[in-house]
């Protein structure tokens, strides 16, 4: 009797264990079918807001609550929007401002200057950048245009008159050849492109024949060769070429070791005797 009782109890326990396992399996399968699981549900749970519970229409600005209708979040600070109905609100560091009336320059808020048609930033300062303005922003500083020079431009930290000057290496330089000449820079100097050339940082004379540079010099390629940065006459050779700083005729001569010129001898190596 005891033996049968033990067998019965084991059967009941085994049935319960199997039933629990089956129920748990069915429950997990059902949750997976619906697209969630205990782990997934835990991952999808939203983190608490850093500024606590929000009312409808509220947003978080760092740890502060604010109403985006009346405020802007400026650098983690709720700032009151400009009151004007036509304002174009913007942030300047932690403050809100109206873009129609102010400019934010290097986190500094400044009003538009009076009678300014095209306000702009020059470092932390506001200036009038319009064509007819009397000011220029040069290297981060506001400079006044010279009197009577409405088309003045910047040259480094100074202004210059492009009608009479050129800007060479950050400095205003008078135009070579006068105001009506076309001048360019050759290093820190200006030169007249109609009568001069810039050859390797040196201003050389230009003519109808001297139209090319050879080192720091101008030369006539029809009558001279440029050898090692210096012009040398072709000496009437039919096929002239350079051998170092020497000019030779390739039809009758040979250049040996890049510095010696010898006559070509039939059936002999002209450079052999130089060894």
From Swiss-Prot:
UniProt entry tagged with the keyword Signal: yes
Keyword Signal among record annotations: yes
Family annotation (InterPro entries): Galaxin-like (IPR055284), Galaxin_dom (IPR056601)
Tissue-specific expression: Component of the acid-insoluble and acid-soluble organic matrix of the aragonitic skeleton (at protein level).
Annotated keywords: Secreted, Signal
One Pfam family it belongs to: Galaxin_repeat
Subcellular location: Secreted
Position of the signal peptide: 1-20
Cellular component terms per the entry's GO annotation: extracellular region
Protein name (Swiss-Prot/TrEMBL): Galaxin-2
Biological source species: Acropora millepora (Staghorn coral)
